[in-house]
Amino acid sequence: MSSTKRQIPLLALAIVLLLACARFQVAQTPTLFSKPSEPTAQSLFEDANGYLGRKYQEFNKQNLPYDPKLEQRTKQEQLNLARQNAATLQARKKLKGDDLYYLGLLFHLANNGDAALSSMLQFLKEHDEGSKAQAARTLVVVYGTKTNNLAAAEGAVKDYRAHQPQTAEDLYNIEFLLADAYQRSNEYDKVVEHAEKILEAAKSFANANRTDTFKRDDMLLKSAIMLSNGYVKTEQKPKAVQMFADLRRLSVALPSGSLYKQTTIRLKTLDPNFDTQKLFEDVSALPKTTLPDIVAAQWIDQHPVKLADLRGQVVLIDFWASWCGPCRYTFPKLVEWNRNYKDKGLMILGVTKYYGHADTRPLTPGEELVYLREFKKRNQLPYGFVVGDSNVNELNYGVLSIPTTFLIDRQGKVRFISTGSGEEEIAELGAMVKKLIEEPVSPMSASESSEKN
């Protein structure tokens, strides 16, 4: 039953990982003729927590097709087991230490938030260090914000920040829960206080996680939206505009076409008169960019190149697909720019990938490659194609929609991102191509020369 796999909720996954780090074993000395020992609190939790995994393995061995009713029934069985094991553990006298911790986790599995909160608060009275304490604090925030016990949630966040281990993702999650709770109660000064910390955590996550681009962009955008709402509600709209402008600048540095598009939309909504081109006018203000190389399974009418090899040229990277109507709308301009500027240093790379179909027909990679060659010839596209066999290029450049175009100057800096094929977008892109071509060629620095070599 392979299709029954489901994503673990983010916070639950963090707790599972913290448990893995904090796992311990208690040595026991067997006694001759002793009674069977009762299951430990940890084993009771692991029995319930691992129930779904065990059942899904059984279903896979039986080659059962996905059945939503079976999935629902299996989840209910896990819930019942968690309740049963929690009752077994709770019936024991004078629980303390890790017993309280695992009891809290069992109540969490059993969807008993009040009991989970109570157990974790008792556990934290005795234990304030280590992975288990940090996991307990995340649950206190979850159920504190659900039950409007914001004092407990605030205290747990403060204590989480004061102890280790901690992660940017956990900080993002618990601060977000608090900000959201204050937003529901219209306490917008508190929303701003915690949303600023959410954005800080999202940026820390972005710095440390260069590969999980979609999660990175989602965290950055959601935190910015939360903070923007707080600023607007507290009559600090200029701060909201500046915050999105800064995030838009970050989207160029990452780079991320999706984040760039979303921040541009938000800026225009907040301030219709905002000059979205100003970011690209001051070259010295642009962040240093380390661009990922384009990963290719095949090159069409273009020898393999690395971006570092193209320093000294203006590079236009166009993400497109043969089935994309708006992408085709840009072809005449791409052909025109190639004709006008190729000899002046413009290189265009059309980046696509194998989609497994074309013109409503399923195609093998070999057949699709033949189709792309014929498509290129039929549409008289004079620039090279880059064909990927995975989503790696889209992930690296944060591309969620096409066409998306990145324009890179002769020093290797992203100077413009275009996300769409409207007349305004195409006109702006064309103006930037002309501007970069006409910029004087700067001597290559020693560091740039060594990087290229």
Feature roles, as predicted:
Residues 377-383, 387-434:
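Thiol/disulfide oxidoreductase modules built on the thioredoxin-like
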Residues 107, 143-144, 182, 224, ...:
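Residue at a conserved register position within TPR or TPR-like alpha-solenoid repeats
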Residues 304-328, 334, 348-349:
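Short active-site neighborhood of thiol/selenol oxidoreductases, capturing the structured segment around
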Residues 174, 329-379, 386-395, 431:
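Structural microenvironment flanking redox-active thiols in thiol-disulfide oxidoreductases
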Residues 68-85, 108-119, 145-158, 188-204:
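Helix-turn-helix repeat elements of alpha-solenoid scaffolds
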Residues 249-297, 308-311, 441-453:
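N-proximal helix/coil linker or "cap" segments that precede and/or mark the start of modular domains
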Residues 88-98, 110, 124-135, 147, ...:
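Short solvent-exposed coil/turn linkers within tandem alpha-helical repeat scaffolds
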Residues 24-98:
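N-terminal leader/linker segments that initiate helical-solenoid repeat arrays
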